[in-house]
C-alpha cells in the first residue's frame, strides 16, 4: 500500500494498493456493496477470481471507507505526473529547494546546516539545522513554527539534540520565502 498523498502528491484521502492478487482481491471484496445476482456479476478477472467465491459478496467492512471518483482521478493524475517527472528531476528539484533555504539561513550565527541524502536520487535529501547557541531549544522553535500565523512543519526527530530537520517533499517554490522567514524569525526570537 502506498499513500496517494505525500511523495506522489495526490489527494490525502487516497492510496494505491498493489501486489499479490489474493491480497488485493481480499481488500477489494471488503469494499463492495452488491444488490446483484451471481450470474450478472462480472468482476475484472485480473482483480477478482470469481471461481474462488461461493456467491456475491455482501456489504464489505470497508464499504463506508470508499474513495470518491475525485480522489481516484486525483491519485491517478498525480501518479502520472510523478512518473513523468522522474526520480532524477524530482531529486534535483528537492535539492534546489533545500539549497535556497540553506543559503538564506547561512548568515545566522551559531547554527550549522548539513545537507543529507544529496548523493543519490534514491534518497530524499534533507537539511539538518543544528542550533549551537546557549539558549537553543529546538522543541520550542518547532512548536513556534507549527503555531505560527502560517504553520511551518519541520522534522522534530532530533529535537533533543537541538537539531531541526527540513524535508522537501511538500515544499513548493513560491512558499520558500515564507518557510525561510518563519525559521529565521523563530531562531531570532529565541536568541533574544
Spans of model-derived segments:
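Active-site C-terminal subdomain of aminotransferase-like
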Residues: 2-109, 117-121
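Alpha-helix capping and helix-coil boundary motifs
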Residues: 86, 137-139, 190
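Conserved C-terminal alpha-helix-loop-beta "cap" of PLP-dependent enzymes
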Residues: 95, 102-184
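A common structural junction motif
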Residues: 32-38, 146-153, 184-191
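Short, charged/polar low-complexity linear motifs in solvent-exposed/disordered segments
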Residues: 27, 42-44, 171-172, 183-185
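Short, intrinsically disordered/low-complexity patches at protein termini
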Residues: 48-50, 178, 189-190
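Secondary-structure boundary elements
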Residues: 21-26, 130, 189-191
